[in-house]
Structures are given as structure tokens and as C-alpha cells.
Amino acid sequence: MSGPLARIGRVAVTEWGLALRSRRALVVTLLFLAVSCLVMYCTISIFAALEREVVTALRLPPSETTGTVSMALWKSPIFVRIMDHFAGNSLVFADIRGRHPILLAYAMFLFQVVPLLTLLVSASRVADDVRNGTARYWLVRVTRTEWSLGKFFGEALMLAAAMGVGALAAWGVVLCRLPAADGLRTLPGIVDWTVRAWMYAIAWLGLFLGLSHVVKSGGKAMALGILALLGAAAWSLMLENVSGLSDCLSGLTHLDVLVPEASWPLLWRRSPSAVLQGAVQLAAIAFLYLALGAAVFRRRDV
């Protein structure tokens, strides 16, 4: 266990062990599982209610299974033209056209909730270990950079496990309530969107862990994480409207690469090259913020 990669892996595995002993991993996984099931159940219920209204209004024969009418409407030329008008013929809409609406609803849920899940799981990890003395045990055995990377990869794997369990639970709800979706064909779609959302979560993980390196308590790290979420949302809104400002401020649009929200549309594309570009950008954001936090941490007295 003398190589850098081995030491990083040891820190990551220990992070898993600590999470399991403290039941933190179990609580987070069960929370994500429950929310995934609830969201999928409510989404399918809404689709079923809308289908009943459409069938009644158009005086059509009732469908035996939920989802048949929704899928037919989603693929209809009239609905496609309406969505094209509102989406402005965007590349994202062109790529998601034809995908099952239940899968798209689950994808929207994932991309909205993963920043909060990452905040709950990881925002205070480094600060807590520094405060309770766990960091001192490791920092006489590994370098600070290796310890930071080990924490990062351990938390990334924990997020992957929680999201994977949530994906299987959501698929179970689809099997029970939406047989028209053909469960065997729905599973790859749910797994695909879960992997893409995990890529998005990686950027937030780097940001939150980077912030956790610069404070001495978990509460302060959590507060900084919440401020970062709100600040990123405000920054994205500002960049969307910066085109109407003066030319000297229009250059701010080039700074959108620093915000995770700017890269997630690439993860909604069908093109593997676009998805790869988005994944690389998000990974770069993660390691940028992690490196900045680690740079401050190297100068701290632990």
C-alpha cells in the first residue's frame, strides 16, 4: 500500500467503512430510495389522471394500461410541432423527442435533486473529520492531496450506490404501475439517466468538498454549500440575461463554464460526443473547486 493510487484507494474504502458504521450511507440511500419511489408513483398517477381526461374529452375508448395514450400523444406530429415551437427547435428537444415521457420525468427529477443529495451526503465530510481529529490519523500516513482525493472518490462511489438503489426502486414502481412501458425496455433508460445524473453530481461534489476544506465545522460547511447552490442558480439566471447588458458585461457569458448548470444540457443529448464533452466539463469543474479547497487546506494547521 505504498503507491499514491493505493493510498488514495485506502482512504476511499475507509470513507465507505465510516459511513456504514455511522449508518450515514444507509440513511442517505433509504432517503433517496423513498423519494425516487414517491416521485415515480406521483408522476404515473398524474399521467393516468391526464389520460382519463383526454379519453373522456375526445370520447375515445378507455385504455387498458396507463401510458399508452401519453406515449401516443408524445409521438404525434401535432404535439411535436407544439413542443418545437416552445423549445425553439433546440438540440436538446430534438434528441429527447420520442423518448418515453415517464423516463424524461424521472430524468428531470434526478437533475433537480442530485445537488441537494450531494449537499446532504458530502458537504460537511472534510470539516467534520478535521474537527473530530480523524484527519490527523490519516495525515501522518498519506499526503493531504491523497487524503482529499480519497475523500472525493469515496463520496462519489457512495452517491453512485444511493442513486443506483433509487433507480432500481423507481423501475420497480414502473413495473407495478406502468406495464405499457415494457419494463425490460424501460430499465436501460432509467440506468442511462441515472449515470448521466451521477456525472452531474460529480461537479457539485467537487464544489462542496472544496468548500469543506476551508472551514473548521460541519455546520459552516453546510451553510457554505447552501449559499453555493443559491449563488450558482443566481449566476445562471444572470448569464441567461446578460446579452441585454452592455458589451463590457457580455464577456461574462464565457464564465458559465464555472457553473455546473451550464454543462448539464450536454448530458441530455443523444450524441455520445456531446455527453462525453459534458462529462469532461463537469469533471473539470469538480477537480477545479476541489484543488482550490485543497490548496487552502495545505496551509491550514490541522
Q: Language model features by range: what are they?
A:
Residues L38-A49, G218-L258:
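Transmembrane helix segments
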Residues F32, L38-S124, S148-G219, P265-V280:
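Secretory targeting signals
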